[in-house]
Amino acid sequence: MGYLILGCGGLGTALAHELSARGEELVLAGRQLPKGVDPACYFPLQEVDALSFDALFTLYDTAALPSVVINTIGLLHDINFMPERRVEEVNPRWLCDSLLANAWPHLALAACLSRRMTPDTRLWLCTLSDLAGSLGANETGSRYSYRMSKAALNMGAKTLAHEWRERFPAAGVITVHPGLMDTPMNQPFLHELATETLQDPALVAPRLLDLLNQLSPAQSGSFLDLQGQPLPW
């Protein structure tokens, strides 16, 4: 079973290490080769756009597609913007950047895959989402751009699952909320978080892989936690 991992952040790197330890074939695509990852398994991906993804998928032009594609790309803050606490702080540029980082990669990946898949292709496309993007679970507000972009991701994944069910019935699509992790994404907010709620990505990685290995076709289009339990949309 071959794996393609998008994003070299905390969980993406942890997944690469875990897969290597399991002896699995993998390609890790991202902006910088992480320490401890075999360069032979790395593909430089500087931009999140269709052209870059097409270049990435030239790796598979003469080989079978990966059985599992895991998209870990996501954006909560950058050097110019932090999550909004009030509606007056919502900025159209930041909202667009959040959508491009959190919702677009899933669709761009799906488009590249769809051009190469057949009705018999067996493949799972998994994108990391967040309970913050759930309408049903939103009880605190704030983080407008992040929440809206993750909600858009969830809708895109659900819509894609319906399309693939007709075009590629052996393939599946899910979004997974892995929970809070001790990664650079959450570093600015450590003072607001209880230490015991932060998970080590090295411990999350095997749980995510085990979940993906246990999925059934009926679960395509689901939004799940690491235990495989459905989360509210």
Regions from the language model: what does each represent?
Residues 70, 126, 173-176, 186:
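Hydrophobic structural elements of the Rossmann-like NAD(P)H-binding subdomain
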Residues 175, 183, 187-233:
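C-terminal helical subdomain
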Residues 1-25:
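Canonical Rossmann dinucleotide-binding motif of NAD(H)/NADP(H)-dependent dehydrogenases/reductases
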Residues 154, 164-181, 219-223:
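Conserved Rossmann-fold SDR core element
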Residues 17, 107-110, 150-162, 171, ...:
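Conserved active-site helix of classical SDR/Rossmann-fold NAD(P)-dependent CH-OH oxidoreductases
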